[in-house]
Amino acid sequence: MGPGFQDAYHAFHTAQDERQLFRQIASVVRQLGFDYCCYGIRVPLPVSKPAVAIFDTYPAGWMEHYQASGFLEIDPTVRTGASSSDLIIWPVSIRDEAARLWSDARDFGLNIGVARSSWTAHGAFGLLTLARRADPLTAAELEQLSATTNWLANLAHALMSPFLMPKLVPESSAALTAREREVLCWTGEGKTAYEIGQILRISERTVNFHVNNVLLKLAATNKVQAVVKAIAIGLI
């Protein structure tokens, strides 16, 4: 019988930083009967190459090989998790586009695994993976994992995000005023400063004042980038 939500909840809240929290997550994963675990988070910025942070207890050398081989770009669990929050089960067959990934993983002792994704309001995508060397998954275990990994992945992501988002996306901590959000929203609709002033019944100069404040808060070089950043991290 694995750990319950309340036990994990209280244990996780004792963590002072992301590394302590991950150790607590790994402990719960071991209690669930898995040798290894991995938590990864991908944030929406920079748009051209979203920042990623990964924590794992995998066998030595696997993550270095994984990253050097570019497996992140073709990993089916990442692709599936990005569009579905269902339990992801590692394939028994390795005859797919990621055949080398699965083959190499097995060479490192990563034979059996499941994964579960979750999201936060700031657009951060999290993926929790549980893996082990042997013992195929049974129908009863999968039924249990379907429920357990749901709360575990969401709890882990919800508590990891406050530690990691300010480091990976400093803009996520920006506090925009109601007026700044209004100005940004209308800017996103393609309105000029003059038109926004007419809509909000404020001067064009005041509109530009709010725009400049937003640019500073979001570390943006222009209005377009400010709108993109604000939408990506859920500020508007």
Curated annotation (Swiss-Prot):
Q: Which residues form the signal peptide?
A: none
**DNA-binding region, residue intervals:** 193-212
Q: What Pfam families would the database entry show?
A: Autoind_bind, GerE
Coiled-coil parts of chain? none
Which GO BP terms sit in this record? Answer: quorum sensing; regulation of DNA-templated transcription
List each copy of the HTH luxR-type domain by range. 169-234
What UniProt keywords are attached to this protein's entry?
Activator, Autoinducer synthesis, DNA-binding, Quorum sensing, Transcription, Transcription regulation
Superkingdom of this protein's organism: Bacteria
Q: GO MF annotations for this entry? A: DNA binding
Please give the family membership noted in the entry. Belongs to the autoinducer-regulated transcriptional regulatory protein family.
Its recorded name reads Transcriptional activator protein SolR
